[in-house]
Amino acid sequence: MSKTFFIDTTRCTACRGCQVACKEWQGFEGNQTKQVGWGSHQNPPDLNPKNYKVVRFSEQKLKDRVAWNFFPDQCRHCVDPSCKYPADEYKKGLVILDEETGAVIYTDACRDMPKDVFQQMLDFCPYNIPRRDEKTGVINKCDMCVERVKEGLVPMCVKAC
């Protein structure tokens, strides 16, 4: 049975525990970031090959105060993933939809994909999620901690929240 994420943004305090748990589970080091001139506490500023999840900050000026809204952003693991179409046009099997969990998985073979095909994948994704590591060619994003989910556990970001 396919799984999905439900994030109650009214309860999110932007602690970034989900973001850190994901990085630790994936074995990623911290990103070098700087806040100067950025004007936000969002850190890092966007998803990247070493950040599959980022807590987005949205500041709103209300009548008499400023309000912050937070949204943990990551792959939505679409039921019909549009990012899969350009990959399949290029070569079948690069992007798979795990039937047991519903996770959209980018295989290691994606690293050989030309940059223009990757750009089409990014353009097709309505959430602007996939990222390519320019050094290694690896295309990556949240994998829903598929190995944990298959063992009956929750993804690390969910566990941390």
Give the ranges of each region predicted by the language model.
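Non-ligating segments of multi-cofactor redox enzymes
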Residues: 1-160
